[in-house]
Amino acid sequence: MFTLKQVINKSIQTSMKNGVMSSAVKRSFSTVGGINQPKSRKELSESFLDGTSSTYVEDMFANWVKDPKSVHPSWASFFESSERGVPAGEAFMSPPTLGSSVATKATPSTYTSSGSPKQVSDSMRLLLLVRAYQVRGHALANLDPLGLEVKEEPAEFNPAKYGFTEADMDRPIFVGEGFISGFLTNKQPETTLRQVLKRLKETYCGDIGIEYMHIQDREMCDWIRDKFETSQPVEIPDKEKIKILERLSWADQFEGFLGLKYRATRRFGLDGCESLIPGMKAMIDTATEDGVESIVLGMPHRGRLNVLANVVRKPLPAIFNEFNGGVISIEGEYSATGDVKYHLGTSYDRVTSSGKKVHLSLVANPSHLEAVNPLVEGKVRAKQHYSKDTEQKKSMAVQLHGDASVAGQGVVYETLHLSNLDNYSTGGTVHIVVNNQIGFTTNPKYSRSSKYCTDVAKTIDIPVFHVNGDNVEAVVKVCKIAAEWRQKFKRDVFVDIVCYRKHGHNETDQPKFTQPIMYDKIGKQQPIIEKYSNKLIAEKVITQEQYLQMKNIIHESYEKGYQDGMKHVPNAEDWLESRWEGFKSPIELGNPGRTGIDQDLLQKIGKVLYTEPSGFEVHSTIKRLLKEKKDMFDKGTGFDWATAEALAFGSLLLDGNHVRLSGQDVERGTFSHRHAVWHDQKTDQTYAPLTKLATALGKKDAAEFVASNSSLSEFAVLGFELGYSLENPDALILWEAQFGDFSNGAQVIIDQFISSGEQKWMRQSGLTMLLPHGYDGAGPEHSSCRIERYLQLCDSDPNKIPPKEEAERKQSQHCNMQVLNCSTPVNYFHALRRQVHRDFRKPLVIATPKYLLRYEKSFSTAKEFSNDSFTRLYPEAFPDQINKPEKINRIVFCTGQVYYNLIASRESNNIKDVAIIRVEQLHPFPFDLVAEQLQHYPNAKAIWCQEEPMNMGYWNYIYPYFISTFKHINRPADITYTGRPSSASPAVASHTLHKLQLENFLSNALTGQVGSK
C-alpha cells in the first residue's frame, strides 16, 4: 500500500504523460504570502499535494488504507481513483459553482455509484478555507492592545473565493466522522460553513496569532493544530484564574511600589507588559512538571527587576538595598566595581505551586542587547553535560528579547543557528519577546524590513505564537504550550507578547517627543490589572473584597522588603554557585599547582595518541604523522605543538577535568596540525584518540573530551563557550579562532564579558582563547589577532610593582585576564594545565603560532614536560655562544615567533654582543623577571623588538612597564623600539615587501643599523 503522496505522485505522472499537468501541482498557493484562488478542478485537488496543506486529507487517507469503509464513499472513490493513477486533477468533478469556465468531464473510472463528487468538492473547498486561516489567520489576529494598525481581511478568507455563497453558510457539508483531529473532532460526519468559520476566527484571529505552517515536519504541525483547533474554546478553571490574577497583581504592584519609592530612578519597568510575569511563571510550572530541574534565563533591562523579584524570587531586601545604593564590601569580600541594578544576575532555588523544586539562574549581562544569548545556551549545555542529561529534559534555556533587538541584532540569528548542531544544541529554547512596538524612539517600520520582529524564527523551522499582552489568559496559554513544545520536540519556540511601554525608554524619558499618537493612546489605556480583575469580578470568580485583600497582602510584603532592605548586608557568596565553593577571590592568595607530568604518564598518553585503531582506514598523511609521533616518544625529542597540546588535554582528562575545544575547523586545525579527530577514508566514521584514554588506561573517573567544529560564527560561538565555562571551574574550555584576525567578530563578548565580567558581576571564568597570530607574509587579513587590543583591556597598573616574593601569585589573582605568546610547545602545555591546576580562574588569551607549528627548532623534549610550572620569561637560551654578560651591548626583549627570526639573524651574522630574551607572559607583566635580566646585563642597551607595526602589537603596552622596572632597579629609563613602522593596515600584501621589512627591523634590533633598502 502506498502513502498518499506516492498515490498522488503516481496520478501526477499520468497527468504529465497526458499533457494535462497543472502548474498548481508545483504550488497552488504560498504557505507564507497568501493563497491564490484555484482556477480549475485540477488545481483544487492538487492544492493538497503541498507539504502541510494535505493535513486533513492525509488523515482520511490513512484511515481509508486501514478500512475503506471508514471514510465516506465519495472520499473512498477519490482515493481509489488516485491510487489507480487517474490524473490528480481528474479524480473528482467540481460542481459548476467552482471553475465553471473549465470543462469538467470525468472519466467513467473516476466514480462509483455510492460516491458523490460534490461532497468531495465541498470538503476540499472547505479544507482549503481552513488552511487559509491556518497559514494567514495571524494577519487578522487582534494582537495590538493599542489598536495602532488598521487591518484588512485577507482576500483568501472570503468564502466566495472557494465557490461558496451565502446560501451555503448553513448547508451541511460532509467532513467525515471521528477520524480527523482539529476542528472536526465533534464526532459529527457533517458541519456547516458558519460553524467552521466561527471557530476559525476564534482560534486564528482572536488574541493569539499562530505561525506554524512554514514548518516542514508534519508531526509538529499536527501537534500545534491539535493544541489550538479544539472543537470548542477551552475554559480555564476558576482556581487557575485566581492564580493568574495574583501573579499579575504581584507584577503590577512591584512597578507601582518602585515608582512610588524611587520616582527619579531608572528601573526600565514592565508597565504595559505585566502579563509577562504570570506567563513566565506558568511556563516554568509547566516545564517543571515535565521534568525540568534547572532553567537559565537571559534577558535585557526591560522588566528585569520584576523578573528577578517575582519569577526568580531574588529576596526583596536585596533588590531594595541595591536601589538604596548598597554595595558589597570591597575590602572584605571582593574587588568588584559592580553594575547597575538592571544588569545584575542571580541564582535561586524556587518551589513551584505543585511543590517541585527548580533552580533558576538569571545570567548577568551588559547593555549590549542580545549579547547574552549565546552565554545562556552555553551555560545550559554545560549543565546538561555535567548532569549527564543526554535527553536534554532537565535543563532548559529561556531567552527574553525586545522587539527591536530581536530583529536588529545579528547575534540572535547566530545563536539560533546553533540550536540544532550536535555539540551546541540545548534541546530547545523558549524565546519570549516583550514587544512594546518601539525601539527606544524608533518605530518598527524603521527598525525592521519584515512584518514581524520574530521572522528570524522561520529560518530554523520553529513556531511563533503572537499574543495580545492585555489578554493575560492568552499569554499564560501560549507560554504553557511553548514549554510543552520544547519538552516534546526539543526545538526552539517563540512567544511574541505584543504590548506597550507605559513610560519612555526609562522612567525619566519623555516619549511624546517622538511618539505623540502612540502615547496619547497609552495615556488612555486601562491597565491590564484593572481589565482582568474587573473581568473576574464580573464572572464572580472573585469578589471585590477578596481582590482588595489580595492587593493589601502584596503591598505589605513589598513594604516589609523595603524596610528590611535598609538593614540588608550584601554578600559575595550570594553570587557564587556551589560548584565554585572554595575558589579564591582576587584579593585572596591561592596556591599555584604543579603543571608538569611524570614521564611514565607522558608515555602512556603518547601511546594512545599514536596508535592506529584496527579496522580503521586513516589518511596516508596521518599514518605518516602517527609514525613521526611514535618516534618522538621513543626518542624523547621533537615534541611539536599539536603533541604538546594533546598531552595537556590528555593529562587533564585523566585528572578528571573536562576538556572542550570549539571553533571553526578545530578538529583538524586550520593549519592541518592538530588532527584531534580522524576520518575513516572508506566509511567516513570518526575516531578521536583522546576520547579513548579512559578505556586504554583503565581510568573510570577520566573526564570527557570534546573537539567540535563550530558554525562560521565568532560572536555566538565564543559567547557559547564563555557561558559553558561559567558553569563548572573543573574544566578547560577553549575557543580557537580560525585565524586570530577574525576574533574581532566577537569583540562584544571580549569587551563586555571576558575582560570585565569578573569585576562587574563577580563571575570567574577560565575560558581560554587560542588566536593564531604571526607575520608570515600572508597579508593584512591573516597576520594579526590584534593583540594590542587585548593588552589594552588588561587592568594592571604599570606603576605598581608587587613585592618580589608574591609577584606571580598576587599578580595572577589581581588581574582581570592573562595574555601570553608562547615560543615553545612545552610552555604552551604548561600554560594550558595552569588554567586548571590552581584555585582561581582567569580568562586566558594566547597568541598561538602558525609557521612554528612545523618549525623543528621550536620543538621541545620529553623531559621538559616534567618541569614544575609555566615559564613567564625565557632568559638567553645560548649564553655560551655570546659574550659574557658585562660585554653584552644590546639586550633584545621580544615575544612569540619573532624570537626565531632574531636567533637566525644573530647566528648568520655572527653577532656576539646581543642577548635575546623572550617574554612569554605579557599580562600580568613579569616585573621581577625583567628586572633580573636588566641587572644581569648591566651595560646593555634595552631594545623591544616586534614583528607588528609600531602602533600595534606590544610596544605601547609594554613601554610603561619597562619604564617602571628601570626606575625600580635605579637604572636610567631607556628602551628603544624596533619593528615595522606604524600602519593603518596590520600587514603588507606583498611577500617581497614583507621580507624586506623583516630584514630591516631584525638588523636594526641586533646592530642598530637598518638593513639593505
UniProtKB/Swiss-Prot annotation:
Which is one Gene Ontology cellular component term of this protein? mitochondrial matrix
What top-tier enzyme class does this entry carry?
Answer: oxidoreductase
> A Gene Ontology MF term for this entry?
oxoglutarate dehydrogenase (succinyl-transferring) activity
Going by the entry's taxonomy, the superkingdom of the source organism is recorded as Eukaryota
Q: Which positions in this protein are listed as binding thiamine diphosphate?
A: 302, 403, 436, 438, 664
Reaction(s) catalysed by this chain's protein: N(6)-[(R)-lipoyl]-L-lysyl-[protein] + 2-oxoglutarate + H(+) = N(6)-[(R)-S(8)-succinyldihydrolipoyl]-L-lysyl-[protein] + CO2
One Pfam match, by short name? Answer: OxoGdeHyase_C
Which sequence ranges are marked TM in the entry? none
Q: Which InterPro entries does the entry link to? A: 2-oxogl_dehyd_N (IPR032106), 2oxoglutarate_DH_E1 (IPR011603), DH_E1 (IPR001017), KGD_C_sf (IPR042179), ODO-1/KGD_C (IPR031717), THDP-binding (IPR029061), Transketolase-like_Pyr-bd (IPR005475)
Q: E.C. number, please?
A: 1.2.4.2
Transit peptide located at which residues?
A: 1-39
Q: Which GO terms describe its biological process?
A: glycolytic process; tricarboxylic acid cycle
Q: Which SMART domains match?
A: Transket_pyr
Tell me where in or outside the cell this protein is found: Mitochondrion matrix
Q: What does this protein do?
A: The 2-oxoglutarate dehydrogenase complex catalyzes the overall conversion of 2-oxoglutarate to succinyl-CoA and CO(2). It contains multiple copies of three enzymatic components: 2-oxoglutarate dehydrogenase (E1), dihydrolipoamide succinyltransferase (E2) and lipoamide dehydrogenase (E3).
* Family of the protein in this entry: Belongs to the alpha-ketoglutarate dehydrogenase family.
Q: Which NCBIfam families has this protein been placed in?
A: 2oxo_dh_E1, PRK09404.1, PRK12270.1
For this entry, the protein name equals: 2-oxoglutarate dehydrogenase, mitochondrial
Source organism of the structure: Dictyostelium discoideum
What gene name is given for the protein in this entry?
Answer: ogdh
